[in-house]
Amino acid sequence: MMRPVVVKEKRVNESHIHAVEDEVRQAKTMDRDIVKHAMKQSVAKLNPKVMIKNPIMFVVEIGFVITFILSFFPSHSSSIPGWFNITVSLILLFTVLFANFAEALAEGRGKAQADSLKQSKKDVFANVVKENGEIVQVSATDLRKDDVVIVKQGEMIPSDGEVIKGLASVDESAITGESAPVIKEAGGDFCSVTGGTMVVSDEITIVITSNPGESFIDKMISLVEGAARQKTPNEIALNTVLTSLTLIFLIVVVTLPIFTNYLGFQIDTAVLVALLVCLIPTTIGGLLSAIGIAGMDRVTKFNVLAMSGKAVEAAGDINTIILDKTGTITFGNRMAHTLLPVGNETIEQVGKWAAISSVLDETPEGRSVIEHVQAKSISYNKELAEQGEFIPFKAETRMSGVDLQDGTKVRKGAVGSVIEWVKSQGGTIPKDVNQKADFISKEGGTPLVVAVDNRIYGLIYLKDTVKPGMRERFEQLRQMGIKTVMCTGDNPLTAATIAKEAGVDEFVAECKPEDKIAVIKAEQDKGKLVAMTGDGTNDAPALAQADVGLAMNSGTTAAKEAANMIDLDSNPTKIIEVVGIGKQLLMTRGALTTFSIANDIAKYFAIIPAMFTLAIPQMEALNIMKLTSPLSAILSALLFNAVIIPLLIPLAMKGIAYKPMSSNALLGRNLLIYGLGGVIVPFIGIKVIDIIVGLFI
């Protein structure tokens, strides 16, 4: 009897395995396509008009041209063999190609994301409601702002808009990747809809909020393709420093022959070019653009749309995070927290009747009561409740429960409503009911009274529960030197209780939306950078004021327009991950800059002795690596300089490992790993390459 079941299960497992294997194959195929495209682009980017945007690599390209010409038209006074010039020119060419490949690879990943987004932009038609009430079908490309459109079940939402009538379930998987549909309704903070999403139930009327080319998907495509990417202030500053270093070393190398002629010897042009390329920070110069693009790419993979690289960088410098209590720190729905018996009743009795009243209750509160009772190992008769008649909650009665087959009536609900119901049954009210109800209210909870016929057994303490792991996450932020401030409309006592439980640094009680702006400005006046999340129209001013404003995709258009980041999953806690990505971006750029500059130390000890030993024998003392010959030393330094770029591409794309700790601790750690490592690795690498090159010279 068991054999068919086993075979069926095996087949199911095999089909699942095949599906996973297909996904892996598709991912590998996409990666291969991206790499092939990047290789083609690395050659196309050799165009001087493109290269001049990266001054460091442009200098290397000019060096390639000079040495390539010298390969065919060598100087008459040159003592360098002809093969040396062509070898140097090829190494310089590949140095530029590797740098171009890094940038093209990062851009290619963005283009792949853009292509998948473009697939969601299908040719759809919209049912436009004219002023006279007539419904006309037009192409989505002909829609304009303020047009009114009716979207029915199974139809694609033609463009961005806001629901002005009706309620519907909308499948946003094309945008967010989340398969579960979300409810969109007129009014409130969940009225915003996005073009390219599908209505899966009911019917809604929306007003269009964007013209063609200005929709949410259009902006996403533009951003991930890099069309709207601008260099950030930090990136510009670093690029300026690196360009200045390049200019200084260029002046040094150009004027060097004057001094060598005075000393009675000449240095070949190819050697001078090699010296310049080894001195300038080519490693970080070749990876700088890729790091910035990859940082935007990492944010996008978290389903967060950053309006600019500046926003991602700002997230890395954040000092203070403003967080709403409801939905961010807490679940936002009330859950059973404690059972409080009254009079002479026991917790077991309260739990038993609370569970029976909730067996048929499908609300989140009802489910949480069952889970709480089961966690307390309190027994109850589930079948007894299932055989009874469920009494749903109504605004008029403010109670729910079940009428059992034997005539017993079980109720749970608001304190006043249940007390009146018990009195109508001829029952008496225990003295401590109101006392315990007041205690729950003062704690910020919601009291529900549990009664059976004319007898009150106790209360259920419903609490907006703090999300698991929040204390640990706030501790990580504290280690990073980031202060957390919780804003809530609760009274100070309740706010203090939740703040203590969650582990936030500060809280603002009885906070109104306009108070958030004051909190943000107060922090900014102290020189702090502030991040906050929001989804409502009333959050828009604060989102605009914050240095990093993360709006929820489920929120209003006003909130999304005010923010500089949008979370497609509408998860407010994701601001913590965004801060981590921002810090990782800054750390990656800083670490690779440190590594690149530290590399120069080893290159000095390789190329300087090689250049001057013949004329100044005392310079041999600097040849601490005992390199084979001057020509081998120069080629080894150049080869290492070229090869290190592709080796560091995965690190630039993925970002360096990030652990929450203070800025000083991070600085010390990165100086040790990438500063000291940047000195040691080239010594080893150049020596190994020299041994190999020495076999051929």
Swiss-Prot record:
Record bears the keyword Protein biosynthesis: no
Stored SUPFAM superfamilies: Calcium ATPase, transduction domain A (SSF81653), Calcium ATPase, transmembrane domain M (SSF81665), HAD-like (SSF56784)
Subcellular localization(s) per the UniProt record: Cell membrane
Membrane topology: Multi-pass membrane protein
Metal-binding in keyword set: yes
Function in brief: Part of the high-affinity ATP-driven potassium transport (or Kdp) system, which catalyzes the hydrolysis of ATP coupled with the electrogenic transport of potassium into the cytoplasm. This subunit is responsible for energy coupling to the transport system and for the release of the potassium ions to the cytoplasm.
Family listed: Belongs to the cation transport ATPase (P-type) (TC 3.A.3) family. Type IA subfamily.
Protein name: Potassium-transporting ATPase ATP-binding subunit
